Amino acid sequence: MTLDISKYPTLALANTPEELRLLPKETLPTLCDELRTYLLNSVSQSSGHLASGLGTVELTVALHYVYNTPVDQLIWDVGHQAYPHKILTGRRDQMPTIRQKDGLHPFPWREESEYDTLSVGHSSTSISAGLGMAISAQKEGEGRKVVSVIGDGAITAGMAFEAMNHAGDVHPDMLVILNDNEMSISENVGALNNHLAKVLSGSLYTSIREGGKKVLSGVPPIKELVRRTEEHLKGMVVPGTLFEELGFNYIGPIDGHDVNELVKTLKNMRELKGPQFLHIMTKKGKGYEPAEKDPIGYHAVPKFAPSNNSLPKSSGGKPNFSKIFGDFLCDMAAQDPKLMAITPAMREGSGMVRFSKEYPEQYFDVAIAEQHAVTLATGMAIAGDHPIVAIYSTFLQRGYDQLIHDVAIMDLPVMFAIDRAGLVGADGQTHQGAFDLSFMRCIPNMVIMAPSDENECRQMLYTGHKHTGPSAVRYPRGSGMGTDIEKDFTALEIGKGRIVRKGEKVAILSFGTFLGNALEAAENLNATVADMRFVKPLDEALIRQLAAEHDVLVTLEENAIAGGAGAGVIEFMMQDKIIKPVLNLGLPDRFVPQGTQDELHEDLGLDAKGIEKSINDYLAK
């Protein structure tokens, strides 16, 4: 699938930033229109992130037009909004492959392009990294400029403010751009603020401001009065006082969809010294009405026909694990008014929309603040409530200290509902849930469960909710197996697995939703299969039994082999002096790139055929 570039004559002239900078300024609005249309037509045929990129077209064009990329370093926070950047940096013809196996990476990726300064995927890292680059550039005496682009969601994270606080202290030359598409200050956008932005970033204003500071620097009270007067005058028309207090020169807010005004302002700001902050207002989904009306729905899209003005409806079928969790929350909250559900900005992805509407007083979206989410749950547990933290496996990494220090050490009853455990597919290395078993298994007091199907997931969530200490239930992205779901809740016995198939010689110890693959592989092998259920505590009696009755044990998990469930089995066997060959199957010691889940499982030998082959190869040694 390729798009006919002849239908985009101006875009055809700007395959790289060098070519873009040769275009007359008068052509930039036309370029933006073509780029936006190209993006819509491309993503609708390939699937991928759409609404964010539609909102950053003008900003992307202006940045590459003004800044000498890749010498000047441009950092996109998270990276959802970077599709226009990829199109303008020599990857236009590869866009149909984005998020696909062996295709373009879904986010800016250093290995992919010299224009991708920082590999990203998680939020709120851009200002810290940009500050480091700016400090190094200043130390080396280079004229290199650094720009960090961050959204109004990502800037709420503590890490972003930690970086700005530090930048205000060390005062390097850098620019932070806030891409604001939600805040209530949108009414400030208009001719007055665009004019103010040009004035505040212009050389006359800057020279007067800096000259005045030098003249009055020996008179501290007057210097302070001048500073505060300047802030208050600006604060009358712009909401920049907070960023000024952090040590930034605040400009804006300005219209982020007026490419020529952006170019003027950026040219002025590129020459300024010290930390600069540009606040732009944009509309997520800009230029495609359905995405403007439903930016959340069009954030990440499947293949669709833009002319239909709608996304294809789900075919229904088996419920996904996120829905299983959402239904559990609603059913459990009906019985337990002390249930408190917490999410760090993942309401839709975690299946919590219905719960947030039916139980708004028991629902807490803390924004992108994983550390706070975990310790908030700590406070609720101490107060006698029953908190549940709904979080993706990859994002729990960001709250690890709090998990240990604020939950596990005090043995508090906080349950972690860990979604996207294992390989998530198209989002690649930064989003694979490969490590949660490894980093949780070493924490004292933790109970860790890995369900094999939808009903087991529901009952494990109930088990964790009723447990008197910290617990975690980890489940994968996507649909279940079609298992019948019991409406009634049944608490499982902690640390007990079950044998689901009796065989000979080989026993497969399955942790999680690979159970179906294990059973299929076991048919030709005539192997025993156990659904272990608990990663911690392990069912030690069952391991002893399986070791005594079989020649070889095989552990199977969708987690890194290093430190995972299989490693726990071997540790126990060595401590118990059980000497039997053990084959660990799981994720390898490398970061797994994007692809569909099925493609990745096949590549890694974790589908039924791969499991059977690995076991036969091991037996043949």
Swiss-Prot record:
Domain of life: Bacteria
Keyword Kinase: no
Sorted UniProt keywords: Isoprene biosynthesis, Magnesium, Metal-binding, Thiamine biosynthesis, Thiamine pyrophosphate, Transferase
Keyword flag Metal-binding: yes
Family statement drawn from the similarity comment of this UniProt entry: Belongs to the transketolase family. DXPS subfamily.
Binding-site residues, thiamine diphosphate: H80, G121, H122, S123, G153, A154, N181, Y288, E370
Gene it is expressed from: dxs
Pfam families linked: DXP_synthase_N (PF13292), Transket_pyr (PF02779), Transketolase_C (PF02780)
Catalytic activity: D-glyceraldehyde 3-phosphate + pyruvate + H(+) = 1-deoxy-D-xylulose 5-phosphate + CO2
Binding residues for Mg(2+): D152, N181
EC class (word): transferase
Pathway entry: Metabolic intermediate biosynthesis; 1-deoxy-D-xylulose 5-phosphate biosynthesis; 1-deoxy-D-xylulose 5-phosphate from D-glyceraldehyde 3-phosphate and pyruvate: step 1/1
Cofactor(s) the record lists: Mg(2+); thiamine diphosphate
UniProt GO MF annotations: 1-deoxy-D-xylulose-5-phosphate synthase activity; magnesium ion binding; thiamine pyrophosphate binding
Cofactor stoichiometry and binding remark: Binds 1 Mg(2+) ion per subunit.
GO cellular component annotations of the record: cytosol
Matches recorded under InterPro entries: Dxylulose-5-P_synthase, THDP-binding, Transketo_C/PFOR_II, Transketolase-like_Pyr-bd, Transketolase_BS, Transketolase_C, Transketolase_CS
EC number: 2.2.1.7
Protein name: 1-deoxy-D-xylulose-5-phosphate synthase
Biological process per Gene Ontology, one example term: terpenoid biosynthetic process
Purpose of the protein: Catalyzes the acyloin condensation reaction between C atoms 2 and 3 of pyruvate and glyceraldehyde 3-phosphate to yield 1-deoxy-D-xylulose-5-phosphate (DXP).
Subunit architecture: Homodimer.
